[in-house]
């Protein structure tokens, strides 16, 4: 629930974040770890850190902006722009969302938390982060690059011959099928946290972590749907078109 400006006055950080977990991210952007200043009032934090309350609220409001474009808009976008949109999401995941969650988990004090999965989460998440980053980099350097080659070849017939060997090396159909059928990267964490359930969770720090993980899981699902329902189907059609053109060129020669 978004906490309005008038409701921030004389409120402790713990109360503000408890009512609206996204204020934890907003505070983080101003160099404030909410769990280190939980008993401070917002006015005191603004003075200590040297920022205005209105700036904090403005940043918090910006976090409500829609993560995704309308699918219909992406369906009609040129394919190279769909790729750029997905790369933008990758950049957001790697440089913004995941480092923030990783920092929250690393700084979780488990000494006073009687949940076994807290230590498990501290152990598992760094490995997840590393594997996810490697997956994204591989996707960009191989799959996205290949799809961009298809796009530019379609707009410049001189590039067609350059695609011949790439099309022999990459099975876009198999990649698309594997991507559609693979388990979500978050399935293990989802199971560990019982679908991010806040039942019986008293630690505010842990509640924020769970809600951030849940939000990331949702964002990742949207991202995967764009790849599965828009990017790959359109790229496969384009690949078929270019394959036919290459066959025609070969026949004429």
Task: Describe each region flagged by the PLM.
Residues 1-253:
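Small-residue-biased structural context
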């Amino acid at each position: 629930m978004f906490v309005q400006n008038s409701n921030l006055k004389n409120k402790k950080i713990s109360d503000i974040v408890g009512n609206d977990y996204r204020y934890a991210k907003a505070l983080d952007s101003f160099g404030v770890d909410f769990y280190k200043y939980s008993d401070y009032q917002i006015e005191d934090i603004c003075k200590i850190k040297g920022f205005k309350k209105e700036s904090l609220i403005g940043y918090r409001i910006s976090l409500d902006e829609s993560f995704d474009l309308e699918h219909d808009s992406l369906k009609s976008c040129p394919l190279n722009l769909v790729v750029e949109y997905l790369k933008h999401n990758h950049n957001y995941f790697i440089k913004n969302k995941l480092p923030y969650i990783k920092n929250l988990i690393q700084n979780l004090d488990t000494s006073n938390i009687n949940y076994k999965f807290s230590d498990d989460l501290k152990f598992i998440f760094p490995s997840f982060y590393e594997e996810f980053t490697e997956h994204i980099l591989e996707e960009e350097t191989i799959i996205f690059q290949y799809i961009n080659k298809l796009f530019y070849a379609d707009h410049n017939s001189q590039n067609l011959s350059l695609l011949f060997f790439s099309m022999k090396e990459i099975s876009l159909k198999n990649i698309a099928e594997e991507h559609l059928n693979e388990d979500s990267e978050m399935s293990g964490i989802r199971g560990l946290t019982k679908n991010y359930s806040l039942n019986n969770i008293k630690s505010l720090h842990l509640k924020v972590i769970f809600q951030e993980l849940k939000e990331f899981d949702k964002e990742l699902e949207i991202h995967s749907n764009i790849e599965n329902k828009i990017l790959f189907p359109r790229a496969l059609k384009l690949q078929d078109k270019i394959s036919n053109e290459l066959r025609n060129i070969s026949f004429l020669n």
